[in-house]
Amino acid sequence: MGGGDGHNDQDKGLFSNLAGGLAGGGHYPPGQYPPAAGGYPPQGYPPAGGGYPPQGYPPAGGGYPPQGYPPAGGGYPPQGYPPAGHHSGSSAPHHSGHGGVAGMVAGGRAAAAAAYGVHHMTQGHGSHGGHGGYAHGAMGMMPGMGAMAMASSSTVSTVMESLSRESTGRARSTDTRSGSNLSFSISSRTFWATK
């Protein structure tokens, strides 16, 4: 490499021995810059005709809105609208009586069915019966599903408790098993949901 004094003045960089012949002498840009013909902007630009806006714009007729708009007849709504005989009232159907109670009872039945199903899932009464071949902690479901089902039953029981108070007024709490339970009656059936 060079001399013995420890200074290396021969290295030019990685692969510098290969790039020397490719760049044509190693100077950039090649040739003269800027070109001798001229600078910026190129010849012929901007057009000799003028600037902005181009000739003939905007039209000589006027601005906005175009002539003939809006129609001379009037504003909004157009004449003849709404059609004769149109009733302008609420579009929602009108029901009198106790229609809301039927919807509440139907909703309560659906919620009770959901609680009933969750209760059976958490107590090991799945489709295979008993424990379904899994360990006791899985409660008849796939391994690891017991905690999720228990959390769901807790949520369902809270909802069911409020529904039962509103619809029947016969909710009661008992502590007969390891957890607290909720029972209530809808349509002469008693459902249990584990909290």
UniProtKB/Swiss-Prot annotation:
Annotated Basic and acidic residues bias: 163-175
Gly residues bias locations: 47-77
Top-rank taxon, per record: Eukaryota
Biased composition (Low complexity): 82-94
Sequence segments annotated as region (Disordered): 23-103, 159-182
Signal peptide: none
Protein name from the UniProt record: Glycine-rich protein A3
Lineage start: Eukaryota, Viridiplantae, Streptophyta, Embryophyta, Tracheophyta
